[in-house]
Amino acid sequence: MHEKLTTRFAPSPTGYLHIGGLRTALYNYLYARKNGGNFLLRIEDTDLKRNSKEATKAIIEAFKWCGLEHDGEVTYQSERFDLYKEYVKKLLDEGKAYYCYMSKEELEELRAKQEAAKERPRYDGRYREFTGTPPQGIEPVVRIKAPQSGEIVFKDGVKGEVRFKAEDIMDDFIIARSDGTPTYNFTVVIDDALMGVSDVIRGDDHLSNTPKQIVLYEALGFKIPKFFHVAMIHGEDGKKLSKRHGATDVMEYKEMGILPQALLNFLVRLGWSHGDDEVFSLEDLKKLFDPYHINKSASCYNAKKLEWLNAHYIKTLPFEEINRQLKDLGFDLSVYEKAGFLLDLLRERAKTLHDIINGAKSIVNAPQNYDENAVQKFINKNNLELLQAFANTLKDQKTGKDFEDFTNDFLEKKEAKLKDLAQPIRIALTGSAVSPSIFEVLEFLEVDECKKRIENFLKVRGK
């Protein structure tokens, strides 16, 4: 029925999309695209008390920002409760599941006895073969008849052969709560099977769920998918990645001025590699990615590597793409004259899009204030006089090369060096001692504007 390789990403909308979740989504997306398959998005929103519409919206926005296009409509588990109830009934009718009338007090008493005997807490199966009259006042749960002995074995695409002893890890676990709502493992199996999911790539925090899900696949007569359990992302201190290591919400990276191309490139390398290559476009990855080559061990988050990749993409992406991302941050470079030249001025040194935004503002807008530390460090009576003479002799220079040649000739005549003039020019033109090449800034602003800014600076400094 389902011939295509099909993967899925299935987040719970109880919080915003974590970068670990985005990496999982990316791996599933790439594997599907490489094989001409389907990549599905399912929102696991059965926990009606904890669900957040804002979180659901943020997940979908993050997908859109990153360019991960899913196939078909988004599936919402909250719209499928009737379907889950049908399959609970099927298992009950076939004798593969049963009603359990154990009260809360009985369960607590059982756990206390097991703890006293230093046994693993587990349900004891007392209602497994129950045929009597149900106790009054108890809303039953539904439990699956799980195997009580033997092994559950599966081949994991990352970890290799994985074995679980049934008696060590499993009791007759609940598939429907007393209010009729289905449990996580049950809904996952129903949805993956009915949506035709052939390959499940997910974090290895789900590894312990897998034997329970295999029991359900077998009880329901569904084909078991291939599993790939990916190790967690750790911080540079070797501990599980958390907010203390930096941003974890995907959309925080957008606000920080990180490009989606850089973030995806960064994340794919946290657990997967292709030789010594570091830079991959999404199109490259659709051809190269192979989940069987995912590392078994945890990967380490490296903020410097992300910064390096972001700088690379700022340098190399076309103007239209950079400006599209800038617009999402509320800044449109295209409103300026010579916008392409302005971007080229700024992109060589920029590490984030905010460097582009701040740099553009400092060049395009005449400074209202001057960096006092820079003024104290670089400005003195001698170079103010040199700056005045420089402005007075500027005439008809056009290109950066024109300005460079003119400046060198000017300095030679004045028996001065570039270090005596470059920073005063930079401060006068931009208000700061940090900017792109001073000759390119002169070219961008042109002679009249340069003269005006230098004169204004000299006036402010009391010259």
Swiss-Prot record:
Keyword Nucleotide-binding assigned: yes
MF term (GO), any: zinc ion binding
Gene3D superfamilies tied to this protein: 1.10.10.350, HUPs (3.40.50.620)
GO term, biological process aspect, one: glutamyl-tRNA aminoacylation
Pfam family, one: tRNA-synt_1c
Annotated positions binding ATP: K243
Function: Catalyzes the attachment of glutamate to tRNA(Glu) in a two-step reaction: glutamate is first activated by ATP to form Glu-AMP and then transferred to the acceptor end of tRNA(Glu).
Protein name as catalogued: Glutamate--tRNA ligase 2
Organism expressing this protein natively: Campylobacter jejuni (strain RM1221)
Classification of source organism: Bacteria, Pseudomonadati, Campylobacterota, Epsilonproteobacteria, Campylobacterales
Gene it is expressed from: gltX2
